[in-house]
Design a protein with these regions (language model features):
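Short glycine-aspartate micro-motif
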Residues: 2-6, 60-62, 90, 108-112
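Glycine-rich phosphate-binding loop plus the immediately following alpha-helix
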Residues: 127-157
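Short glycine-rich, Thr/Ser-proximal phosphate-binding strand/loop in the N-terminal lobe
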Residues: 2-43, 56-57, 127-128, 133-134
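Short beta-strand scaffold segments in enzyme catalytic cores
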Residues: 12-17, 100, 111, 117-122
C-alpha cells in the first residue's frame, strides 16, 4: 500500500492507495517540520496517523508539505521511516506534489495560491525554475486571510 500526504502547518490530508485504487482518505494535524520538532512530529504520526492505517503493510510514503526543504525535510523523512516503517519515503515540497498531481511525468507550469503561494516550471521530474515564496506574511495571495481582507476592504468602502 502507498500512503500520500499533502501537508501545511494547520492540517494534513492523507490518501491511502492499494491495488484497487484509493482505499481511503483521512485528515490529521498539520506537519510542518520547519516549525515542529522530532517529538511533536512523532506524536502526530503515532497518535493520529498510525490509528488510521490498515493492518496491511505500507510500502511507500510520499509526503508533500510546507517546510520540507533541507534539514527539516530530512528529519521528517527519518520520523516517517521510524514510525510507519515503509521501504520508501519521499519528502518534497507542496509545489512538487502539485506538479506531479497535475502533470505526472510531463512538463508544465504549476502554481499554488494561498499561504506561501508560489509557482515554478516542472520538467517532468523536478521544479527547475521557481518563483520564491514570500511566506504567509507577504505571499498569501488567495489564502483565507487575503480573501477576507479584500472582502472587508471592499465592503467598508
Amino acid at each position: 500500500m502507498i500512503l500520500i500526504a499533502d501537508s501545511g502547518s494547520t492540517k494534513t490530508e492523507w490518501l491511502l492507495v492499494g491495488k484497487q485504487g484509493i482505499e481511503r482518505t483521512f485528515r490529521t494535524s498539520g506537519i510542518n517540520p520547519y516549525f515542529l520538532g522530532e517529538e511533536e512530529i512523532r506524536r502526530v504520526l503515532t497518535r493520529e496517523v498510525l490509528v488510521e492505517l490498515p493492518i496491511e503493510r505500507i510500502t511507500d510514503v510520499y509526503f508533500y508539505g510546507a517546510g520540507c526543504i533541507g534539514l527539516p525535510g530530512e528529519m521528517l523523512c527519518l520520523q516517517l521511516h521510524r514510525v510507519i516503517g515503509p521501504d520508501t519515503v519521499e519528502v518534497n515540497s507542496v509545489l512538487i506534489g502539485a506538479a506531479r498531481a497535475l502533470f505526472g511525468d510531463k512538463a508544465g507550469i504549476v502554481a499554488i495560491l494561498g499561504t506561501g503561494s508560489n509557482s515554478g516550471f516542472y520538467d517532468g521530474r523536478d521544479i527547475i525554475l521557481q518563483t520564491p515564496s514570500l511566506g504567509f506574511i507577504l505571499g498569501d495571495e488567495g489564502s483565507g486571510s487575503d480573501l477576507g481582507k479584500h472582502l472587508l476592504s471592499d465592503a467598508m468602502k
